[in-house]
Amino acid sequence: MAGGRDMNQATAIAMATPSLEDAQRSRLLFCLFCACTVAYVLMRHANSLLLDPDSWWQVKVGLDFLANRTFPTVDPYSYTFAGQPWIAKEWLGQVLLALAYDAGGWNGVVTLIIATIGLTVFLMGWFLSAWLKPVLAVVLAFVAAFLVAPIYTARPHVFTLPIIVIWTAMLFRAAQEERAPSPWLLALVVLWANLHATFTLSFVIGGLAGLYLLSRTGLSKPVLLAKWVAFGLLCPVVSLVHPYGVKAILATLTVAYGNEAVPLILEWRPFNAQEELVKEAVMLLALFGLLVSRLRIGWAKALFIVFTLHAYLSHQRFMYLFFLLVPLAIMAEVAQQYPALSAATWLAQKRDGLEKVLARHYYAISGAVAVLLIGAVSVLGSVQQIAPSPKTSASGALAFARDQRLSGNVLNSYNFGGTLIFHGIKTYIDGRTDQLFLDGFTKTDDATGHSDGKPLLEARLKKYAIGWALLAAGDTRIPFFEELGWKRAYADEYAVIYLPGA
């Protein structure tokens, strides 16, 4: 396909369209509207962003860093693995959460998360509308945002969503236009590496984009290929610009290969079609569309789709790789092979009434949106006080423990580890199982809740000199505590406290 045709269609049509500026303004406002709609929906369900028990300790790690200005190298938060090697590899994301918490409590944390998700949706719409009609682009962006909603939690991975969208869109665009990737993209790798451990995905996505270039040019442009190879080699190098250096990469590998906790954590479990009917329907519909349409994407992009689908089917947490990135990767082919859907066709048409209004009042609308956003944040902070779910906070139980001056080591349910860390109580187990609670510890802890787990539980109570137990109301070990003579000292809808019998 000729190089001119392969150019970004919005750029190609610019030379011939007098109303390009108005069209681009309309395009921008369409994307802004989509982002604001998603942000509004999230604000209406803000408490759902704080359902993850790990939000507690992620914020606490950031707060401790701001207070001490030191990067931890050993575990300071549990008694079972105290002093064992542990690094805050996602320190920058944790600091951002802590700064938001300092500024506005949990309301501030939620506001920051919603703003980041809104930015992600805006970028999705913007990159898609470079090739597709804006209305189609924002609909796709909105649908993608809805499908990946389960990953919207107050944790550092959310801060990487705008980065992975930019990274994927820019690299595949560079390959499409047969040019070298911009060096400034390497700065995104540095930022990504300090925000969250998924930065190693940048290496894979970059490699697949490079294969796409190779599928287009073959070996006919050796200088260009050399630039791509150099860029790819620099990605892991610049990721070492991190307080922990290569340890951050090694810590990522411990999760990916052989971590005993992975099968026990919901987000790491494989895709389950019986529980994800909507997502299954979307994937089957997409597969059906590829099979019956005339869309040709080439082997490199097919490999990219296979990679993202494999990651999602293997671990539910990677759903965003498929639903966010696949549209970005194949949008050029859709626009080229179905011109009626393309941005080029839209740009060549006369602007309709709505588009003219948007373009004519661009600055007024943008200003109004800014005022509304500021007002919404103010209302969110003053009217609705957001707090983590009682299912993870154990607020009543911890108040009882504080009033009764309970002391000694606590045996806690997994989901209460975060709130214990936040409140300065050393944990038995918590959500940092990517680096800690290994060597059989997590497996044994899980086994204590099985039907034959009472002897294992009794052994652990003695081994770790447990002074009290903080358990979720549905913890399967509760009958064992009663059989072992422990007394229920506190109970509510969400948590139970047991103390040793006389």
Sequence positions of predicted segments:
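Membrane-interface alpha helices of multi-pass inner-membrane proteins
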Residues: V41, A144-V148, S182-A197, L234-S239, ...
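Short periplasmic/luminal acceptor-recognition loop of GT-C membrane glycosyltransferases, typified by
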Residues: R402-G440, G467-A473, Y498
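Short acidic/glycine- and proline-prone juxtamembrane loop motifs at membrane-interface regions
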Residues: Y152-F159
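Transmembrane catalytic cores of multi-pass membrane glycosyltransferases
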Residues: L66-F71, A197-L295, F323, A329
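Membrane-proximal, lumen/periplasm-facing interface regions of secretory-pathway glyco-
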Residues: S342-Q404, G417-G418, R432-Q435, T442, ...
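Short hydrophobic alpha-helices at membrane interfaces in multi-pass membrane enzymes
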Residues: R173-V190, L224-A230, W299-V306
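Membrane-interface transmembrane helices that cradle and orient dolichyl/undecaprenyl
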Residues: W167-S182, L287-S293
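Transmembrane-helix motifs of polytopic, lipid-linked glycan transferases
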Residues: T111-W131
